[in-house]
Amino acid sequence: MSFLKSFPPPGPAEGLLRQQPDTEAVLNGKGLGTGTLYIAESRLSWLDGSGLGFSLEYPTISLHALSRDRSDCLGEHLYVMVNAKFEEESKEPVADEEEEDSDDDVEPITEFRFVPSDKSALEAMFTAMCECQALHPDPEDEDSDDYDGEEYDVEAHEQGQGDIPTFYTYEEGLSHLTAEGQATQERLEGMLSQSVSCQYNMAGVRTEDLIRDYEDGMEVDTTPTVAGQFEDADVDH
């Protein structure tokens, strides 16, 4: 395939953790041949015997896992899903943000499978992948976890220093939502109203019917028991 190119394999300077020879590479079900898989901290690379191969950047890798399905014709292998599209006519993988002419919003996905001849090496390959992937966290996940607002210094405010942070009321907050956020808000409100009006069943009988029958047809004597009321009852000794 034309996207295969010649490049030097990653070495110790790039944090090479695992070098697995005799590994078959499969792209979207199409075999690329047998070569060497290089799992480095900087990138994931595969090169065949002629020196042609490809590299995957960790930020584009959305999933990696071990496939233990022996019924698969490939057998046990390392599975890697990439958020990029590899095309025969292109020299480089086309990332999602570069597909401006796409007619839909479907994110491109490419599946790689690496099948080593030595199946006992799969665990070490997977562990090396986990370690390298952890060095390249998703920026979107980091942004969602971090609070990007200004810190509110209570002590400074009490001394008349610093600005009061801006808060939105519920209505004002809705006006700042994006179209997607507003759609999500409406969907959540619909789910909430549906759950409130939902009638729960108990042994096939609606609980509200039980409560109504209980209130209409059953009287409960709330008169407190007087001490000594049953003192004249027979008691077996």
Swiss-Prot record:
Superkingdom in the source lineage: Eukaryota
Annotated InterPro entries: ICln (IPR003521), ICln/Lot5/Saf5 (IPR039924), PH-like_dom_sf (IPR011993)
GO biological processes: cell volume homeostasis; chloride transport; mRNA cis splicing, via spliceosome; spliceosomal snRNP assembly
Pfam families the record matches: Voldacs
Positions where Phosphothreonine occurs in the chain: 223
Gene3D superfamilies for this protein: Pleckstrin-homology domain (PH domain)/Phosphotyrosine-binding domain (PTB)
PANTHER family listed in its UniProt record: CHLORIDE CONDUCTANCE REGULATORY PROTEIN ICLN (PTHR21399), METHYLOSOME SUBUNIT PICLN (PTHR21399:SF0)
Record's protein name: Methylosome subunit pICln
Gene designation per UniProt: CLNS1A
